[in-house]
């Protein structure tokens, strides 16, 4: 089994380097100023925030954050989203396009994931960004790092993930911006060559949030959004302030036209007056805390939470879901609806033992929808966070069916996968 795993890993790296070799021809011809954004959560929101400031002066890796995807993006291609035969096309098209396709923007703002060990490092060694923005650090894909910890390479999964993300800091040429509250980020950037700026909560002067809007009073001015934004987004805004100051560019503060990435804390109107906050794109403890804290800041009645499993937690699964139970037990939700095997097994007992909340759990997503349709009266604000295709539940509760455009996993492949769960 280990031999097969190592063979797959070697093949992955070989193929990634193949595409990197060809895409680099186009990149060298383009020669943009590269700003890399990485972290466990919040990368895509940070990418979208930079777009509000740079507009057409930059190209953004909206559909790519992996070793393969970034190479495809540089030559103007998308990765494999449907047929696997597209791999054959890409093996031919990437070399061909590398000789004639060139982006023209001054900046390349690229989102980089750390899902697999060595993936961030491969991109860091290649791109060598002028600026690295390290947004966050958490156990987003912990399952992929368990073997590194078991081998003795790292003391724990947190150290392993931090080291991988830090490769972008180690290879940054000029500037690295980090969360000053993270000791691991500070440790990993102590001896790097680039200048390090650690942002802190002192940059946030005040925070006001409602289901339909948010205002952050920051050092440079007040940022206004038309969606509910977690308080933790002050970090991205503070990082944005530091980036714009470094580049000598003016900041746009009115962000009411800003559209949050799909499945991230988006406000949607539900049937019969119910207010829906869709944050179903992903879920790990760090993002769960962020959204629960956001709801706690809202001075409104009848707060509900629909919480699904946190996947890809590996050996940390029980621990992380138990902590989730403690988080929810301390919240001010009027009703908590749990959906999935993991939250039923680990999270539910913690909330029940606390005894302060009305809580129900379901292992089937359809049963959760049935419960909501029977019990929602129209005065509730409902947070959706977690796996188990909760975006399908949101879809069924929408007042305007066209708002499915704002939901995650709406492509044909995703709809086909959820259909196997009986969710049509």
Model-based region annotation:
Residues 24-29, 55-163:
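ATP-dependent carboxylate-amine ligase catalytic core
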Residues 41-45, 114, 234, 388:
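Residue-level detector of alpha-helix initiation sites
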Residues 37, 45-61:
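A conserved segment at the C-terminal end of the G1
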Residues 30-32, 104-105, 124-275, 300-301, ...:
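Acidic, Mg2+-coordinating active-site environments of NTP-dependent enzymes
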Residues 63-66, 136-139, 201-204, 360-368, ...:
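Short, acidic/turn-prone active-site loops that include or flank metal/cofactor-
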Residues 113-117, 182-183, 282-283, 365-366:
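Short beta->alpha connector loops
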Residues 36-38, 111, 134-136, 179, ...:
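Short beta-strand segments
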Residues 2-19, 30, 43, 55-56, ...:
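ATP-dependent carboxylate-amine ligase
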């Amino acid at each position: 089994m280990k031999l097969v795993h190592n063979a797959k890993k070697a093949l992955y790296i070989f193929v990634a380097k193949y595409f990197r070799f060809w895409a680099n021809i186009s990149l060298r011809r383009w020669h943009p100023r590269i700003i890399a954004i990485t972290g466990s959560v919040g990368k895509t929101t940070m990418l979208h925030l930079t777009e509000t400031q740079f507009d057409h002066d930059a190209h953004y890796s909206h559909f790519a954050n992996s070793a393969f995807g970034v190479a495809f993006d540089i030559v103007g291609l998308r990765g494999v989203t449907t047929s696997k035969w597209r791999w054959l096309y890409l093996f031919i098209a990437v070399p061909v396009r590398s000789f004639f396709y060139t982006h023209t923007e001054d900046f390349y703002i690229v989102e980089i994931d750390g899902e697999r060990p060595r993936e961030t490092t491969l991109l860091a060694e290649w791109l060598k960004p002028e600026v690295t923005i390290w947004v966050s650090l958490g156990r987003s894909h912990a399952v992929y790092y368990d073997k590194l910890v078991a081998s003795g390479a790292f003391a724990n999964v947190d150290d392993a993930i931090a080291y991988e993300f830090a490769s972008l800091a180690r290879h940054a040429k000029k500037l690295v911006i980090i969360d000053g509250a993270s000791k691991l980020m500070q440790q990993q950037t102590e001896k790097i060559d680039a200048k390090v700026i650690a942002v802190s909560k002192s940059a946030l002067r005040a925070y006001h949030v409602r289901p339909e809007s948010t205002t952050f009073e920051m050092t440079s001015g007040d940022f206004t959004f038309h969606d509910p934004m977690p308080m933790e987004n002050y970090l991205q805004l503070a990082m944005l302030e530091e980036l714009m100051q470094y580049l000598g560019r003016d900041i746009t503060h009115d962000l009411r036209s800003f559209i949050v990435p799909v499945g991230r804390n988006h406000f949607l109107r539900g049937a019969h007056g119910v207010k829906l906050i869709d944050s179903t794109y992903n879920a790990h403890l760090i993002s769960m805390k962020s959204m629960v804290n956001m709801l706690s800041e809202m001075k409104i009645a009848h707060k509900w939470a629909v919480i699904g499993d946190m996947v890809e937690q590996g050996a940390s699964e029980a621990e992380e879901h138990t902590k989730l139970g403690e988080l929810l037990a301390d919240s001010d939700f009027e009703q908590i609806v749990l959906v999935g095997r993991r939250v039923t097994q680990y999270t539910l007992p913690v909330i029940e033992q606390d005894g302060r909340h009305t809580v129900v759990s379901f292992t089937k997503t359809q049963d959760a929808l049935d419960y909501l349709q029977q019990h929602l009266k129209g005065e509730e604000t409902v947070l959706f966070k977690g796996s188990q295709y909760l975006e399908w539940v949101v879809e069924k509760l929408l007042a305007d069916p066209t708002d499915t455009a704002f939901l995650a996993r709406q492509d044909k492949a995703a709809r086909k996968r959820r259909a196997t769960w009986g969710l049509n």
